[in-house]
Swiss-Prot record:
Function, as annotated: O-methyltransferase involved in the biosynthesis of etoposide, a chemotherapeutic compound of the topoisomerase inhibitor family. Catalyzes the methylation of (-)-5'-demethylyatein to produce (-)-yatein.
Root EC class: transferase
PROSITE patterns membership: SAM_OMT_II
Summary of the protein's practical applications: Combinatorially expression of Sinopodophyllum hexandrum (mayapple) genes of the podophyllotoxin pathway (e.g. DIR, PLR, SDH, CYP719A23, OMT3, CYP71CU1, OMT1, 2-ODD, CYP71BE54 and CYP82D61) in Nicotiana benthamiana (tobacco) results in the production of the chemotherapeutic compound etoposide.
Gene name linked to the record: OMT1
Chain residues that bind S-adenosyl-L-homocysteine: 193, 216, 236-237, 249-250
Organism placement in taxonomy: Eukaryota, Viridiplantae, Streptophyta, Embryophyta, Tracheophyta
Family, similarity comment: Belongs to the class I-like SAM-binding methyltransferase superfamily. Cation-independent O-methyltransferase family. COMT subfamily.
Pathway(s) this gene product operates in, as recorded in its UniProt entry: Aromatic compound metabolism; phenylpropanoid biosynthesis
Pfam hit, one: Methyltransf_2
Protein name listed in UniProt: Desmethyl-yatein O-methyltransferase
Tissues and organs where the protein is expressed, per its UniProt entry: Mostly expressed in stems, and, to a lower extent, in leaves.
Reported induction: Transiently induced after wounding.
Length: 349
């Protein structure tokens, strides 16, 4: 294929690339992957067979579903083949396991539904305003309020968002705990912005002698369940944070601009003992114009921050190091994990 023809095909594909994740969202909501999984390993089914397990009275359901599955198969999301009788059948690929509940009942599927929910999709129509108007947040342009304010007013979206974040956070923490051993030897760990304590629960399950403090806004920790070894404390992290041997923050700093991050890190510095440390988990922005899948994932995460978080952004390792040094920390250590995520330590001494 000549270069011009190849470029034209890629250009045409780009026009409709947004359809792919929406097709994925549809089969997740229809439980197609679960239906294929229950059929057994390496089993392939026709769309007509699949819809027998979907609650619908639509006589054209099989035909319509086949059109969705055909697109996903063309992107190798599903396997596909033609039987001797001429029927098209579909099965699971290795990729599909990440969208099926694992041994802990979590997967990437809820995040697909969250990111492509109609609420968040509406924000992208205002992405250009973040360039044209100073201080413009696409989400606020779309709804006239911040994402946090909106989630309070829309209980349906709040439930969808929380489900997506819970599963994604659990998967991330599982990888962190497999790769990072810096919780060893700590007596007390403070999780700043810890929500209802899910991350601390996972950490303490691996380090049972560790005591945990889950710190978040009062209305958040008010609904937090009780965990052995975990104390819930409400407050404002931009005012002060509880003291501990180490302070843990997962996907917190990327929500805020440099000024707010510096305020928070200084509060952490003040709360730590002489040899204490801050442990953060964040996406690490590549410092060059990389085109590999992991880098594209982080660039996508950064654009989501541009659309949904006022002042939020992904940062390079150097950016985080500069913030840490300005806040008073002397040493920065990086522990790369999977999919562009790193654990980074900021040491007080």
């Amino acid at each position: 294929m000549d270069t011009r023809a190849d470029a034209e095909i890629k250009a045409m594909e780009l026009i409709g690339i947004g359809v792919l994740p929406l097709a994925m969202k549809a089969i997740i909501e229809l439980n197609v992957l679960e239906i294929l999984s229950k059929a057994g390993p390496d089993t392939q089914l026709t769309a007509a067979q699949i819809v027998t397990d979907i609650p619908t009275t639509n006589p054209n359901a099989g035909f319509q579903l086949d059109r969705i599955l055909r697109l996903l198969a063309s992107h190798s999301v599903l396997s596909s083949s033609i039987t001797k009788s001429g029927e098209r059948v579909y099965g699971l690929t290795p990729m599909c396991k990440y969208f099926l509940p694992d041994q802990d009942g979590v997967s990437l599927a809820p995040m697909v539904v969250t990111i492509h929910d109609k609420v968040l999709l509406q924000s992208w129509h205002y992405l250009k305003d973040s360039v044209l108007k100073q201080g413009s947040l696409p989400f606020t342009e779309a709804f006239g309020m911040s994402p946090f304010e909106y989630s309070v007013s829309d209980t349906r979206f709040n439930k969808v968002f929380n489900a997506g974040m819970f599963d994604h956070s659990t998967l991330c923490m599982r990888d962190v705990l497999q790769r990072y051993k810096g919780f060893q030897g700590l007596g007390e760990l403070v999780d700043v912005g810890g929500g209802t304590g899910g991350s601390l629960k996972m950490i303490l399950s691996q380090y049972p002698n560790l005591k945990g403090i889950n710190f978040d806004l009062p209305h958040v920790v008010a609904d937090a369940p009780s965990f052995p070894g975990v104390k819930h404390i409400g407050g404002d992290m931009f005012e002060s944070v509880p003291s501990g041997d180490a302070i843990f923050m997962k996907w917190i700093l990327h929500d805020w601009d440099d000024g707010r991050c510096l305020t928070l890190l200084k509060n952490c510095w003040n709360a730590l003992p002489e040899h204490g440390k801050v442990i953060i988990v964040e996406w690490i922005l590549p410092s060059d114009a990389a085109t590999d899948p992991t880098s594209r994932r982080v660039f996508t995460a950064d654009l989501m921050m541009l659309a949904f978080s006022e002042g939020g952004k992904e940062r390079t390792l150097g950016d985080y190091g500069a913030l840490a040094k300005e806040a008073g920390f002397t040493t920065v250590k990086d522990f790369p994990c999977a999919n562009g995520i790193s654990v980074i330590e900021f040491h007080k001494k």
